[in-house]
Amino acid sequence: MKRTLIAAVLLTGLLAVQAQEKMSREETLQIAFYTSLDLKAMLNTPIPTDPDVKRPVAIKDGDYGGLVLPEAKLSADTFANAGKEAKSVGQIWLRGLAPMHAGEVVPASKLRTVHVNAGGQEADAVCCALGVCKDANGALELVIYGKDKEPVARAAMKVISGQQENPIELSAERKDDSGVLTLKFLGKYEAAFSVTAPEQ
């Protein structure tokens, strides 16, 4: 019963909340476990990924949810040694949301959707590999992948200074009919990208 309820929180959005909130560690670990049950689907990403399901972060807002899994060996060197080719920094799983590019939702045909079975509850989630690379000007950028090796979205990275509990922290802000997801990496870098309801 407990497992089914936890799954429903993220995968079917049965618990409505007034604003985005960070999910408890217990809930988040359960969700990460469910996403990893089908390893073939989880790891079938355009760039190689090795997500750490023991250090996840998840947020929810009504029918919407996001789960971020850091790369297992994510470190400051990942960013310091970044070049033109993207290096994985993790994965983000989205429920009821899809990335945006140039003000428009990324078409469903370009996104990788994974069917998740969580203790009797079933739902589809968009799974995006996350990478870091340098743009043409040598600046760090976050690249977000769908099905193909060409990223579906990009976001500039800025340097920050702070302490954080997890390798990647995730927060969200509503903006009319869309939202902005902000990712903080190791307390050293930050990137944000827009999301909205997925294409029907």
Features from the language model and the residues they span:
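Sec-dependent N-terminal signal peptides
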Residues: 4-13
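Residue-level detector of solvent-exposed, low-hydrophobicity positions
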Residues: 12-13, 100, 135-137, 152, ...
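C-terminal segment of classical bacterial N-terminal signal peptides
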Residues: 13-19
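Primarily secretory-pathway and cell-envelope proteins
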Residues: 19-96, 114-116, 147-200
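Mid-length scaffold segments of soluble, non-membrane domains
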Residues: 83-149
